[in-house]
Amino acid sequence: MKVKTNNRRDFLKKTVVAGTAASVPYFFSSQKTLASETRAKNDRIPIGLIGAGGMGVGNMVAAKEYVDVVAIADVDKDRCESSNKKLSGGKADIYSDYQEILERDDIKILHIATPDHWHTKPLIEAMLAGKDVYCEKPLTLTIDEGKLIRKVQKETGRIVQVGTQQRSTFNLFAKAVAMVADGRVGKIKRVQCAIGGGPRSPEIPVADVPENLDWDRWLGPAPKVDYRHIPNANKKGRGKSNCHYEFRWWYEYSGGKLTDWGAHHVDIANWALKVNGQTEGPISIGGRAEHPVEYENGYAVQNDRYNTATKFNFVVKYPGAVEMVIRDDTDNGILIEGDKGRIFVNRRRLAGKPVEDLADNPLDKSAIQKVYKGLPMEHNARKQHWANFLHCHREQIEPISDVHSHMEMLNICHLAGISARFGRELKWDNANEQIVGDDQANAFLARPYREGYEIEMRQTANS
């Protein structure tokens, strides 16, 4: 990873504002909600949106009662214009270069909803420009990018919420974690994450770049390649490409299902392990994976179709004979297995004998809020995750999906991807974040940044 350094000292110093979350009853009846804060202070928050695709627009709609979208940046002109109409009635300023938003003093918070390979660079530069950020998951394309993000966050003190909104689903995922914390499954021995397999594609031919798209800037830090697209047989939908949405299925821009859905379910699994006392990180990861193309030395031998894993089963081993399984088959969800019982949770249900036992032995009313860092709880998952971020922005306190816990779990997803590409088990030094005895695999902890798209670092004011 290439980092460019200069001597500009124009970012805001770290600000620490004392504040504690209000004590609130069980579930959604917060005494101090973000909505009431907004009404009382009469100061809706101006926000800049970087990446105007489906997630970015959807999240802004979810947060519309709290924020005003005043600036939008995207390399796709059509997306800029359509999102501007939907989110601000055409009143927001639109840019092709997100750096112009970073330079605006009237914007204190940002939402980054770009493709995965474009998360790290604007996030770091936003923190250094003094902005608090809600960034979509997965936060990084590599493990080393996560090291840099954590370093900059500590130095700047900026508030960063990661878009793993399952943490804010109180009646399912957060409740499952609260049950684990309350000892309802005993000591965890194994946790299984079923995230579904990845898609295949036919050969996707080189195509003309759409006039509305700046393809070079869309690629950004990634290697320069041709734009590819093939329409669906029925001529409906977006077709298949190496661009919008479909970027998920190319290792050059994402990690496939391992970092797409893995960033959700592995996050909850890791959260459960932490509240269960599993303080030590993983020591190895290995298993099997199938790809739609052949691989040599960790790289796909074909560049004209999807290349991320379609089927997989990985076992992550921890000290104390604890395991995490990441698999493509079975029902999508998380199975938490302890020595006293087991529970299954996904976005539709929470089940298991310990769940049934809640009828006669319910959780304490404060149980869920304890695992939710004592923060206010008020909305459905998507709105609540935004409410949490904006509350933490106002109070300058750590949000529920902070960069440090996120990278703990995302490292697991990245290691699974590296193991898949080489087809072998990896030994992991968690303290130093290095693969042990495998220089070839270790090289995949980072990625080169294309010239002109390096991360702009700014020295801290006290350096």
Please describe what each predicted stretch is.
Residues 152-158, 174-189, 197, 207-209:
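Basic phosphate/pyrophosphate-binding loop/patch that engages nucleotide-derived ligands
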Residues 115-116, 120-168, 183:
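Beta-strand-loop-alpha-helix segment that lines the small-molecule cofactor/substrate pocket
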Residues 51, 184-202, 214-216, 220-228, ...:
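NAD(P)-dependent dehydrogenases' Rossmann-like dinucleotide-binding region
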